Amino acid sequence: MKKIVIIAVLAILLVVISACGNKEKEAQHQFTKQFKDVEQKQKELQHVMDNIHLKEIDHLSKTDTTDKNSKEFKALQEDVKNHLIPKFEAYYKSAKNLPDDTMKVKKLKKEYMTLANEKKDAIYQLKKFIGLCNQSIKYNEDILDYTKQFEKNRYKVESEIKLADNKSEATNLTTKLEHNNKALRDTAKKNLDNSKENEVKGAIKNHIMPMIEKQITDINQTNISDKHVNNARKNAIEMYYSLQNYYNTRIETIKVSEKLSKVDVDKLPKKGIDITHGDKAFEKKLEKLEEK
């Protein structure tokens, strides 16, 4: 009787083991089948990478900004946003949808997702870098615009002063503006020249900006009756607003510059092949599992 029971139990165990083995094999087969879609999505992603001229990043990021460079960087950002990221998201979604029904397949998926996440980090670091470059270009363009605004308002100040009837008020305002400009130049020279970027940020916040605010208040409180001198004052205040914008934007350019300095441009993916690290080893492992 005991023999019959033992034989029956063994038979059941063999059936269970066989069923488990079949389930595992079927799960691996299903994984391999769905992995083909992941591979296809990655090929499409690599094709986009090879066709949007990412390799130009090396050249563009290491040369002085020109109008042509600016347009190329903006075009690159649009290509990344409209073509590269959608293709990557499709690939990543396909990878995340790989089955994980059994322990072995779950382990396999976890191993591949490590590779997929490395690709994700690389792609989004690339996107971030291009975005920072465009930010830097935009801030530099803004600085140029604020400089032009400053000069334009200064010319208006000088023109209105020449038209003034009350020469005393005109002289008083001119003297005040010259004194303010000298004080600002001296402060800038003392605190900004030959200073490190972090020190420049602090100097602008703690010395330059408070001085400009004080000068605006001082000019606003000056008693003026002459129409042209009053117009000169208004333009002088606009001139100082341009200076405020100029220095605020300089702070932003420094922040962007600090972020850019932390990026190793040489390690950014610029061709499709650059995101294939570890793929061959994983594919070989998958092939061996299928052969068993």
Region roles according to the model:
Residues 34-63, 112-218, 228-292:
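C-terminal amphipathic alpha-helix
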